[in-house]
Amino acid sequence: MHVVIAGGHGRIALRLEQLLAERGDSVEGLVRSAGQLDDLARVGARGVVCDLETVSLEDLAGGLSGVDAVVFAAGAGPGSGSTRKDSVDRGAAVMFADAAELAGVPRYLMISTMGIERAGAAGMDQEFTDYLRAKGAAEADLRAREIGWTILRPGPLMDEPGSGFVRLAVPSLPFAPVPRDDVALVLRELLDTPAAVGRTLELTAGAEPVAEAVRVALAVG
């Protein structure tokens, strides 16, 4: 499988790149700077310098020709401000989908977040509200497309080692954290699961092995 990951230097992306490379997939990660390329090479991925906020649609689509699946793992990050929340978490996700459709890519997986429906809740700061709204807008755009999309909404992300055991379901799960290791494992499983097309799933730490959790979530949902 040939997979391209936007936000290829992110902590989930690097884990997913390694998982895919280890099983023999061809993996490319789009990164913002040449200084990040060595980190991708160390996990077995090919890094491509591509700023999603400035690249043209035609150039981005050209780089996706012949690709089997794309994963949107990019994000503006904490402290980036409301403007970049919109330009990256929404705008770049939309453009990546435009490019994938133009290139004929059959699958698009988006890493979103739990809690989108809470945007603007009492006591929530404006930047986080804008982040949730940007993610919600990106999700809505993707659902309206013909591409084979899947949206994964993990809970709060942790860097502690994953267990390989998760809880996965259609929205909405009780709010709970999940290790980035396990998010990457679930993404790999979803890439291999055609039945995940057109589904939105929420993910936390749990008690089911990843493959079983995916099977059950798709059967029930």
Where do the protein language model's features map onto the residues?
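Non-catalytic, hydrophobic alpha-helical segments
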Residues: 12, 70, 152, 183-187, ...
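Core catalytic loop region at the nicotinamide-binding pocket of NAD(P)H-dependent oxidoreductases
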Residues: 190-214
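N-terminal Rossmann NAD(P)H-binding glycine-rich loop of SDR-like oxidoreductase domains
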Residues: 1-25
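Flexible, glycine-rich beta-alpha linker
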Residues: 118, 150-169, 203
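Glycine/proline-rich active-site loop of Rossmann-fold NAD(P)-dependent oxidoreductases
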Residues: 120, 161-166, 190-199
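NAD(P)H-binding glycine-rich loop region in Rossmannoid oxidoreductase-like domains
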Residues: 29-95, 99-102, 191-195
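Conserved Rossmann-fold NAD(P)-dependent oxidoreductase catalytic core, especially the SDR/UDP-sugar
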Residues: 26-28, 34, 76-141, 145, ...
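Substrate-positioning beta->alpha
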Residues: 134, 174-189, 199
